[in-house]
Amino acid sequence: MASKQIMFDESARKALLSGVDKVANTVKITLGPKGRYVVLDKSTKPVVTNDGVTIAKEIELHDKFENMGAKLVKEVASKTQDNTGDGTTTATLLAQSMIREGLKNISAGANPIEVKKGIEIATEKVVGYLKGKSVEVKGKDKIIQVATISANNDEEIGNLIADAMERVGYNGVITVEDSKTMETSLDVVEGMQFDRGFVSPYMALDTEKMVCEFEDPYILITDKKINSMKQIVPVLEKVASEGRSLLIIAEDVDGDAQAALILNIIRGALRVCAVKAPGFGNERKEMLEDIAVLTGGQVISEEKGMKLEEFSDYMLGNARKVTVDNHKTIIVEGRGDKADIDERVRVIEAQINIAEADYRKTELKKRMAKLGGGVAVIKVGAATETELKEKKMRIDDALNATKAAVEEGVVTGGGISLFRAAATLDSLDLDGDRQIGVKIVQRAIEDPVRQIAANAGREGAEVVAAIKAESSEHFGYNAKTDVFEDLFEAGVIDPTKVVRSGLQNAASIAGMVLTTEALVTDFDEEKDERTAAIII
């Protein structure tokens, strides 16, 4: 077993803060409409980006103790990205501010547990304020505003996303693909999405994005569990002989079958991805039939007297494209007969009319939308591959932020919603060191305004003073136009979910760091420098 090195108390917390600072200082320069870019050194060619989570993920520090701090603040960015798809830079900045101020107070003798409790209470209060000020997103104009701001003030992207949502609905499926030209455009194609991802991450052919994408694949649909390779050998032989890819939708794929598929995928012998069938019980059977009709295949079921081992070509479905990640599967342009699809939609519509339970009606409507609706595809074009990657990142951010805005509404942007929330914390009067936690949050939630101003070349303290002098809750600094104005009227807005999630994730990680008393990591005699840590 390798030797371990342990660091305690003040030294441990200082090492964590050093790691946090190195990540946060790199990320926060991208905040706001005048935020700067960061160039990442990749194995093929450099990537230019101002996407917070992309930058954070690239940072690994040499010092193992500092790297722990870096990893913790990277988790803030990742969690916020997973929850909302945007707001990662603000979340990272908030975490840094809370950790820095918290450690100052703990060094001066404050009780870490009480400080953490104060941070939690203050965060809850701010979240309540944000929810109270949230405005529901109605109309195309508001969607354009949210999408444009999240896309780093690119109006073309804002309009494209608004058009896409208008055509497939707020809850419709919108994907982003490379264009074959330099133009960025919107297409709407028939498609279906369900909430099941690949059964093993080894099936993700694109390991950077953790997705599996197939063009013109065969689709095998069954309600059986596949646990032996023998069950699917006939299908695999056909697929391999034609050089095609295969999506397997089954109750489950495990045991020897999963192991053998993964081995063949790694060797490059097969292009296969397996996902669990969506739904449960009778609903699962109905959804599998929907997929079969959409793709022109058959549900291979023993209830119909069909067996996988006795497979025939007509049982396989087809689609123009399938995309599978850890959580969902999207089937685009199923090759099913249009008359069969229309008939299936009519059957579901009839079931909706006779359904009594609201839950049943809702589920049927979802199925009908998936079968009869479409997938909006934003095709991204650019002059260079570097520009293309950067543009796709911005569109992904804008798309996620817009969906978050539809979900929970919007608040004033430019850091103002958090800035104005600071005043509500004046009413909190907690005992002892809990009040220190409140003051830490109060200071931290003013930092986004300071940083946006600094990135725009203004003095943060002057901007803060000017905003405090005005009582209007929407008044703030518009970094894009370099004027002070009513930001809500000017269309500078943020999704409430993005702001809320970023604050909560930052407070959670800050509380963990502030209550840390020891760090333990491996020690390599040949590689690692001796530090203040104890080596065992």
Swiss-Prot record:
Return any one Pfam family short name.
Cpn60_TCP1
Enzyme superclass (EC): isomerase
Query: What are the GO cellular component annotations?
Result: cytoplasm
Checking PROSITE patterns in the record gives:
CHAPERONINS_CPN60
Residues forming coiled coils: none
What is the annotated localization of this protein?
Answer: Cytoplasm
Q: Name one GO biological process term.
A: protein refolding
The main place the protein resides is cytoplasm
Q: Where does ATP bind?
A: 30-33, 86-90, 414, 494
The reaction(s) this protein catalyses: ATP + H2O + a folded polypeptide = ADP + phosphate + an unfolded polypeptide
Do you know which CDD domains this protein is assigned to? Answer: GroEL (cd03344)
Q: How does it assemble?
A: Forms a cylinder of 14 subunits composed of two heptameric rings stacked back-to-back. Interacts with the co-chaperonin GroES.
- Indicate the family of this protein: Belongs to the chaperonin (HSP60) family.
Report the protein name in the record.
Answer: Chaperonin GroEL
Q: Which organism is it from?
A: Methanosarcina mazei (strain ATCC BAA-159 / DSM 3647 / Goe1 / Go1 / JCM 11833 / OCM 88) (Methanosarcina frisia)
